[in-house]
Amino acid sequence: MSRRPTRLRDGPSGAGAQAAILEAVGDQIDNDDPPEVRQAYERLRKLGHSVGDARKLIAACLSVEIWHTLHPQGGGYNRERYLGALKELPQLPESLR
């Protein structure tokens, strides 16, 4: 049975992975690559989400893609799935609900 991706959690378990994913999100926002990440970030901020919460929501979408890339049955990275998940924020990707 394959495991589904889990939400980013606070605490010592997975803290390094969470920090790395949040750093990657920051890089995507700063570099405007892909531009849909910055668009999602700006939209979430306009909806009233804090800087940290907006980044964590985007990180949740990125974590799903990382899972799909690393898991043997994950099927690999899918840009369209990632961009689609960003458009749906603040609703989390289905695999995290």
Language model segments and positions:
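Structure-specific DNA junction-binding interface
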Residues: 1-97
